[in-house]
Swiss-Prot record:
Active site per UniProt: H320
Subcellular location as annotated: Cytoplasm
InterPro entries: Cit_synth/succinyl-CoA_lig_AS, Citrate_synth-like_lrg_a-sub, Citrate_synth-like_sm_a-sub, Citrate_synthase, Citrate_synthase_sf, Citrt_syn/SCS-alpha_CS, CoA-bd, NAD(P)-bd_dom_sf
Region (Disordered): 1-26
Subunit structure comment from the entry: Composed of two subunits.
Known catalytic reactions: oxaloacetate + acetyl-CoA + ADP + phosphate = citrate + ATP + CoA
Domain of life (superkingdom): Eukaryota
Keywords: ATP-binding, Cytoplasm, Lipid biosynthesis, Lipid metabolism, Magnesium, Metal-binding, Nucleotide-binding, Phosphoprotein, Transferase
UniProt name for this protein: ATP-citrate synthase subunit 1
CDD domains in the record: CCL_ACL-C
Residue sites binding Mg(2+) per the record: E278
PANTHER family assigned: ATP-CITRATE SYNTHASE (PTHR23118:SF42)
SMART domains documented for this protein: CoA_binding (SM00881)
Organism the protein comes from: Sordaria macrospora (strain ATCC MYA-333 / DSM 997 / K(L3346) / K-hell)
Amino acid sequence: MPSATSTNGANGNGNGNGASASPAPGNLSANDNIRRFAAPSRPLSPLPAHALFNEKTRCFVYGLQPRAVQGMLDFDFICKRSTPSVAGIIYTFGGQFVSKMYWGTSETLLPVYQEVQKAIAKHPDVDVVVNFASSRSVYSSTMELMEHPQIKTIAIIAEGVPERRAREIAYVAKKKGITIIGPATVGGIKPGCFKIGNTGGMMDNIVASKLYRKGSVGYVSKSGGMSNELNNIISQTTDGVYEGVAIGGDRYPGTTFIDHLLRYQADPACKILVLLGEVGGVEEYKVIEAVKQGIITKPIVAWAIGTCASMFKTEVQFGHAGAFANSQLETAATKNKSMREAGFYVPDTFEDMPALLKQVYDKLVADGTIVPAPEPVVPKIPIDYSWAQELGLIRKPAAFISTISDDRGQELLYAGMPISDVFREEIGIGGVMSLLWFRRRLPDYAAKFLEMVLMLTADHGPAVSGAMNTIITTRAGKDLISSLVAGLLTIGSRFGGALDGAAEEFTKAFDKGLSPREFVDTMRKQNKLIPGIGHRVKSRNNPDLRVELVKEYVKAKFPSSKLLDYALAVETVTTSKKDNLILNVDGCIAVCFVDLLRNCGAFSTEEAEDYLSMGVLNGLFVLGRSIGLIAHYLDQKRLRTGLYRHPWDDITYLLPSLQQPGPPGTEGRVEVQI
C-alpha cells in the first residue's frame, strides 16, 4: 500500500517540498501527477522532553475526516515540510484502501488502515494520533492506541466524553507518559511544524496569522475558538506564535495549563507565555503556585474569561462543560486578581490584552531576549477549485449541460417544477414524462395519451423476439439488468422500431399532399414496405383492439387528428390488396403522436420536427416494453425455470459437403448443397 513519507529531499515543485519523482514498482507512471512518499525504515529520534512536535512529526488521523486531513497537508505544504505530517488514516469500518489528497497542486495517496496494529507496524515514525472518534467510541479507541509505546501524543477532538472515561484516560496516559490534548478540543499548532486537525481555521486565516513560521510566544487556552483569536492577536503584536494548545473545555482534560506552560518554560526558543483561562475549575492556581515558587520564570500574559458572571444573581453555565464556578475561588474575577498579585501581566479587560502583550514583547526585544527573524516570503496558498469557484475567482466551461432536472437545492426540480408540486398536483407518470422529455407541462389529455402508450406497449406475450431474449437470458441465470438489456437489444426496424419510420413516412407523404393511393404507389415503386402497415396475426376482420382503443381516445380528446385520418385512408387502400395490411399499433401510435405534437399548442413546428428526429417515438416503445420485459424476468425467476436449450426437432441442419480436390488454388473451398 502506498505510504506518505519522503524518499529524499528532492525539490519536486520549486517550494522545497521534497517528494519522489518516480513511482514505486507496480504503481502508475511518473507523469500521472501523483506525488509519492516512501515509508521510513526506522523510527525518528525521540524529541526533547519539553517538545510534542517538530518539523518531522508524523501522525495518524483516526476516523474518516478528509477535510481535516487536507487542511493538515495544506499547512505542511506552505510550511515547506519535506513530507506530509499525516502518515495514514485509521478507519475501522471501511477495509484497507487509499485516500487521494492534494500535496500542493499535485495529488498524493494516503493509506487507510482498518486496524491500529497494522498502521503502527507500517509506520514506525508515527508518534502522534489525532483521534476524531465519536464520544461513544473514543474511550475504547484511545485505550487501544495507548497500548502501543510508539504513540506519545493523542489529541481527542470529541465533545461529550463521559467524565469517568475522561478521567480514566488521563490516569492511564499519565502512567504511560503519554500526552493527551482534549477531550473537546480543536487541538493545537506549532507554526512551521505541525497542526492538529482543523486548528487555525482555513488557509487564508493561517497565512494572515503567520502560522507558517515560528514566533516566540507559546500560549495555552481552554477554548479552541479563542485560540484562533489568540493566533490573530499574537501575530499582530509580536513576532508570532511559537506553539499553541487548546486543552479543551470539559471538566477533566487530559493535560492542563500547567503541563504545557512547564513545557514552554523548558523550551529555550519560547520567550513569552500566554494563558487564557476561564471561569470554572482551579487549574490557573497551579500556574500561580509555579510562578510563586520560581518554577516558571518567563513572563506570562494572562486573562480569565467570564468576568461578566458576577453580573448575574445566580451562577451561570457558560459554553464549556467546565465553565461553571462552584465557589468564589473559581470565578474569573478572583482568578485575574490572583494572577495579577502573583506577577502575571493581566490586563484590565480582554480588549486591553493585545496592547499589554505588545508592551511585554517590545521590552524583550529591547533587552535582546528576542531577536526578530527576517520575515520569510509569504507562501502561496493552494486553493481548491470548488472554493475558488464559490468565491468567483475562476470560471470554466462545463463538461455537461442539463436542462431537465436539478438536485442541487433543497428540493429536486423536474424542468423547474419542485417534486412536491409533482405529487401535490398529481400530474402522474405522463406529467413527469412531459417535464423530463419535453421540458414543459403538456395538456392533461396529452399526458394521459403518453400513459396510454406505455400501457399498450408494455407487453405482447412471450413469443415476440424481445420477450424471448429476456426469457432465455433469465433462464441462463443472469441478473435483471442483463436480461432486460438482452430483450431491449432486439428492438429495431423489425421489432418495435417502426414508430419513428411510420411517423416519418406518413408525415412526409401528408405534407407533400400525396393522396393515400399515390403514397402507396410511391412506396411500391421504391420497393419499400410502409412502416406501421401490416400485422402477422391481426387483419381487417380480426382487428387489433389496441389500435381501436387509441383511435377512440384520439378522436374524442385531440383537437385535431388529420394525420390519423390520412393513415386510416392509406389503410383502406392497403387492405383492399391484402386483408392483414392494416394500420398496426406502431403506426397508429406514431401518427397520433405527430398529431399531438403539431396540434396541442405546446410545440412550434420546428420543435415538433426536432423531437421526431430525435427518436422520441421509439423511446416510448422502449420505456413501455421495459415493463413487460421485467415482468418476464420476474416470471421466470418465480417459476425457478432452468437453463433453456432449444430442441433438435425444431432446427433444420444443413451441413456443407467437402468436394474432392479440384484445380490448384481451390483448396479449402466448400460448397453448400441445399
